[in-house]
Amino acid sequence: MGNFIQPKGSTSTEIAREILSKTYSINYSEIDFIKQNLSVNGLKLLIDPNTQYIWGTISSLETGTISSWSIDSTGEIMTVLTTNGTLTLRKISVSTSTTTANSIYNFMTSDDIYNIKNVVGIEINVDYALQKAINSGLMSIYYPPSKGIYVHSNVCTLPSGFNMYGQSRKPYTVSNDASFNNCGTVIRLASGSPGIFVLSGRHTFDNIVFDGRNNTVGSMNATSQVSGCRFEKCGFYRWGIGLGRTSGYVATVYARGCNFSGNNTAMQDWIDSRAVDCTINAQVSRGIAMRTGANNNAWVGCRVEWNGTDGFYFYQSVGNVITGELIDRNGYAGITVADGASVSVTTCSIQRNGRISSNTNNGANILINDSGIILLNGNRFTSGVDDGGTGVLTPDYDIICAGGTGKILIASGNSFSGGNLGYMKEVTIANKVITGNYGLPDIVNTGTYQKSSGLVKMGNTSTGTLPPAASNGTLTLSLSRPAMTQYMIPQKIVLEISARDTIGGRAEYFTVPLLCSWESTVPVINMISSKLDTYPDNVWGPSTNTPTGVQVSVSTTSDGSTITINLVSMDTRNRQIQAYIRGA
C-alpha cells in the first residue's frame, strides 16, 4: 500500500494530525512530526515526515527535547535521544496511509503490533482493538497481512453495514495450525468461543482467511437470522459450518471466489443466496447441505469435490440451481435430492462420486430419495478411480432412485457413460421424463404421452396376472387417457395387450382399434373387432368372436378419462398381462 500523499507546507501537518487524532481518539496536540529540538512533553504519537510511518505507544512519552533518532535493522524499533534520556518507540502503523484505510493496527498496542508482524503463527486477540474501532464510528476496517494470527472471541457485535478487508492467500487444504502460517490476513476463532464476532447483517468481507480452529461452530454467528452478507475472495477452514450459523438460517448470502476446506460442512441452510466461482474441497462431511426451508439458492461455476459424504445434499429444500463446473469424487452421491427437495443442474461434469459407498444407494453420481425432484440438462456423467489410478472404480450407477414414491427425474441433452454397474438403478420407480440423452434411452412414464423401449404410449401401462378359468380367472386393468368432451370429433386409438403363458411358456398378443366418441349422455368406447389382430389366432377377442383363450371387453368412466379393460379366462392357462393404449 502506498504512503499517504499530503500537500506541502503547514497543511501537511494539519491533515495528518487531524486523521490520527480522530482515529486514536486522542487530542490533536498529542501528535506531531519528529524533528530536532521538538519537545516530547505531552506527546503520544510521532510521525516520521520522510516515510509517514507512525511511532509511539499511545501513552504519554517522556519529557525533554529531541536531539537525534535512529531506526534499527528490523525497521520496527526507533531510538530517540532527548535532553532527558533515551526513548524506545515501536512502529504502530505502517504509515498514515493505513490510517486513512482504517487499519486495525491503529487500534492495537505497540506490543501486539510488533508480535503479530514479526512472530510467525502467534495468536493475538484483537477484540479490544476491533471494539475501539467500532466505538470510534468506523464502518470499515483493514486487517493488514501479518505473520501472526488475529483472534476474535465473539465479544464484538458488528454494526449493520460494517465491512472488513484484508490481503491473503487461500490454502487449498489444511491439516493443522501451521497450514495458516504466512497466509496473510488470517482471523481465527478463539478457543471455546461460539463465534468470531456477532453479525448484524449487510457486511462485506474481502480477502480474509477465516479459521474455525476445531470444527465446532458456524462462522456466521448472530442472535437471529442474518442477511445481506457478502464474502469476496475469502477462505473458510475448520468450521462446523463454513458459511452458515451453528443453528438457524442465513439469507441473501453472496460468496464469490472463496475457498472452503476442512470444515464439517462448507455451506448450510441458506435462503435466497448465491455462490459464484467457489471451491468446496475436502470437507469432513458434506460439501453443501440445504435442509427444510433453505430455499431458492444458486451455485454458479463452483467446484465441489473430494468431500467426505455428499457433494450437494438437499432435503425439503426447493428452488435450487447448480450451473457449471465440476462435482467430483465425493464420498457419497455427488448430488442427493430427498423428500420434496428440488434442484436444476446444468452444464456440469459429474463424475467418480460414491467414492466410499459402493454397493449402497449412495453409490451414485445422482441419488433421488423419496419425493425428490431433479432436472438435468447438458451435463456429463463419468466414472473413474482416484487421480493416481488407485482406489475403487465408482460410482455404481449414474443415477439411483430409492426411498418412497413421488420422485421426479427430468433429463435431456446429457451424456451418460454409465457407472460400474449400469446407468440407472430404480429401487423405487421414479416419474421420469428422459429424452435426447447419450447413453440413457428415452423413457417417459408420466403425462398424456409416454415412451419406453422405443414405443410411444397414451397414458400409463397397466399389468397384472390372469388366472385359469377354473380359478375364477378374471382381471381388470385401468388405462388413463385425456378426458373426452361431448360432441367431440371421434378419436381412434389402439389397445395393445401382451401376455406370457407361465404354464406353457407361450407368448401372446392382442391388438384392436378403439373408437372413442360422445354423442349422447355418456362417452362410448367401441371395439372395432373386424380390425383386431391376435396371436395365436382366435385366442383373444370379444365375446362375439368366441375366443378360445381370453375374452376382452372395454368400458370408460363418465368423463372418458379412464378406460377399463375386463379380461375373462376361457382356458387352463395362467397369463402375465401388460396393456397400454397408443395413437392409431
Swiss-Prot record:
GO cellular component: virus tail
Subcellular location(s) of the protein: Virion
Alphabetical list of Gene3D superfamilies matching this protein: 3.30.2020.50, Single-stranded right-handed beta-helix, Pectin lyase-like
Aminoacyl-tRNA synthetase recorded as keyword: no
Entry annotated with the keyword Lipid biosynthesis: no
Function, as annotated: Functions as a receptor binding protein (RBP) and probably mediates the attachment to the host capsular exopolysaccharides. Displays a depolymerase activity that specifically degrades the K25-type polysaccharides of Klebsiella pneumoniae capsule.
Protein name: Depolymerase, capsule K25-specific
Organism: Klebsiella phage K64-1
